[in-house]
């Protein structure tokens, strides 16, 4: 049985509007999409903000603990975050 390759969450944008975001795992990369309302079309999010990457990392860590994703995926996402946001602090104490 294959693991679900989509992870979604909600956040607010800079203008205070609620936004739905989902990340889709394709090969070795994650593609991000967003929309404002349930029946709006999903639009590709070409440059996801740091907060979205951290939401994805948190969700992947939880899925790894439940054996829904492979542990290597955490390292791949952390590496990608460091490439995109070199000044960012990524704490890994949750792996414990």
Which residues does each PLM region occupy?
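Short, charged/polar N-terminal "headpieces" of proteins
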Residues: 1-25
């Amino acid at each position: 049985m294959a693991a679900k390759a989509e992870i979604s969450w909600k956040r607010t944008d800079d203008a205070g509007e609620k936004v739905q975001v989902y990340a889709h795992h394709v090969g070795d990369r994650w593609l991000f999409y967003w929309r404002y309302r349930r029946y709006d079309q999903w639009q590709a999010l070409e440059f996801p903000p740091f907060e979205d990457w951290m939401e994805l990392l948190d969700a992947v860590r939880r899925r790894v603990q439940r054996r829904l994703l492979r542990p290597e995926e955490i390292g791949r996402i952390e590496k990608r975050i460091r490439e995109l946001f070199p000044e960012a602090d990524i704490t890994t104490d949750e792996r414990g």
